[in-house]
Every structure is written in structure tokens, then in C-alpha cells.
């Protein structure tokens, strides 16, 4: 038989667990609502066009609709999670410094993507692949404390695809079937650069 001192503790534990479950359920519901509102503010028309074009070129390159959807969904989820962490002041000073470095690296990547398209005979797939992998490493460092192994896997899925030298060579082939996709991608990225969204 339980002593009187043990009974209230057991009851308090039951109450705590129930409240904890309720709070978790609320967070999950709120999280979905917040994610949707953040997604619409983060992904403007230009970003959406770039993502759509990335999807089309990925689908055509891989010949696999599900794989293309997975890569783009993982990209969107990663961007949204990063934005949620940043907007909720979850990063420490070191992570904020890494975030600034990451933003500069992404800007450099965007400028390089466009430059390689605009200036003939400058394309170097190894340069683009290296820049993409540098972005990947910075991103892993930034989210290390905050996100799960599954999220790190999503990051790898996105960067494994886009940093693949064969994919980049096919995308930038001046006589290849992806030339129209590259033009649309660069138009969108140029617009994002002009609007200082990247």
C-alpha cells in the first residue's frame, strides 16, 4: 500500500503529464499554422518561380517525379525551419556569426550561378559544387544544436543533388536540353539579387 506522501506525488505526475501532452499538441498545431504563414512570407512569387524551375529541371534530369518532389520539399522545409529558428532568436552568437557567413556564401553562390550563365566559357562545375558544399557545411554547423538527424539528412539530400558535378554539367551544357531551365533559373535568381532577397 502507498503512503500518503507517495499518493499526491503520483497524482501530480499524472497532471503534469496530461498538461505536457496538451502543451505538445498545442505546439504541434501552432507550429503548423506558423509554418504556413512563414512559408507564404518567405516564399514570394520570384522564389516560388525559382523553386518551380528547380523542380522541373530536377524531374527532367532524374526522370523521377517523386525524387524531384522530395528534393524540393526538403529544400523548402530546411529554409522554413532555419527561418523559424532565426525569427525566434534561437541562435547563440557563434551561430549568428555562422548565419551571416552562410548568407554571404549563398549570395556568392547566386552571383556565380548567374555569372557562369551570362559569361560564355566561364562555367566550372567544380567551383559551383565546392560553393554548394561550403553552404552545406555551414548549414550543418548552424542547425547542429537545434534540428534532428532527419533534418540533417534533408540538408544532405538537397545538397547531394544540386552539387552533383554531372547534374551541373548537364544544366550548364550550352547545347543541352536544360538550357531553357537554366535561363529561367538565372532570370529568377537575378531578380532575387536585385530585390536583395538572396
Curated annotation (Swiss-Prot):
Gene3D superfamilies in the cross-refs: Tumor necrosis factor alpha-induced protein 8-like (1.20.1440.160)
One cellular component term from this protein's GO annotations in UniProt: cytoplasm
Molecular functions (GO terms): cysteine-type endopeptidase inhibitor activity involved in apoptotic process; molecular sequestering activity; small molecule binding
Coiled-coil segments: 49-83
Signal is among the record's keywords: no
Subcellular location: Cytoplasm
Superkingdom as given in the UniProt entry: Eukaryota
Pfam families: DUF758 (PF05527)
Single GO BP term: apoptotic process
Keyword Coiled coil found: yes
UniProt KW keywords: Apoptosis, Coiled coil, Cytoplasm
Its job: Acts as a negative mediator of apoptosis. Suppresses the TNF-mediated apoptosis by inhibiting caspase-8 activity but not the processing of procaspase-8, subsequently resulting in inhibition of BID cleavage and caspase-3 activation.
Matching PANTHER family: TUMOR NECROSIS FACTOR ALPHA-INDUCED PROTEIN 8, TUMOR NECROSIS FACTOR INDUCED PROTEIN
Family: Belongs to the TNFAIP8 family.
Name under which the protein is recorded: Tumor necrosis factor alpha-induced protein 8
Organism: Mus musculus
Lineage: Eukaryota, Metazoa, Chordata, Craniata, Vertebrata
Gene that this sequence comes from: Tnfaip8
Amino acid at each position: 500500500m502507498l503512503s500518503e506522501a507517495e499518493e499526491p506525488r503520483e497524482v501530480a505526475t499524472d497532471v503534469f503529464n496530461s498538461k505536457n501532452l496538451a502543451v505538445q499538441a498545442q505546439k504541434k498545431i501552432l507550429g503548423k499554422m506558423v509554418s504556413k504563414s512563414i512559408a507564404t512570407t518567405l516564399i514570394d512569387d520570384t522564389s516560388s518561380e525559382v523553386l518551380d524551375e528547380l523542380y522541373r529541371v530536377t524531374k527532367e534530369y532524374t526522370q523521377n517525379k517523386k525524387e524531384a518532389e522530395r528534393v524540393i520539399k526538403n529544400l523548402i522545409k530546411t529554409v522554413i525551419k532555419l527561418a523559424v529558428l532565426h525569427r525566434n532568436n534561437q541562435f547563440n552568437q557563434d551561430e549568428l556569426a555562422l548565419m551571416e557567413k552562410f548568407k554571404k556564401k549563398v549570395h556568392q553562390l547566386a552571383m556565380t550561378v548567374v555569372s557562369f550563365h551570362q559569361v560564355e566559357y566561364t562555367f566550372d562545375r567544380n567551383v559551383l559544387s565546392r560553393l554548394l558544399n561550403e553552404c552545406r557545411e555551414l548549414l550543418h554547423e548552424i542547425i547542429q544544436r537545434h534540428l534532428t538527424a532527419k533534418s540533417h539528412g534533408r540538408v544532405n539530400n538537397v545538397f547531394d543533388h544540386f552539387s552533383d558535378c554531372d547534374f551541373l554539367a548537364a544544366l550548364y551544357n550550352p547545347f543541352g536540353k536544360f538550357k531553357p531551365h537554366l535561363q529561367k533559373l538565372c532570370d529568377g535568381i537575378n531578380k532575387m539579387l536585385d530585390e536583395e532577397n538572396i
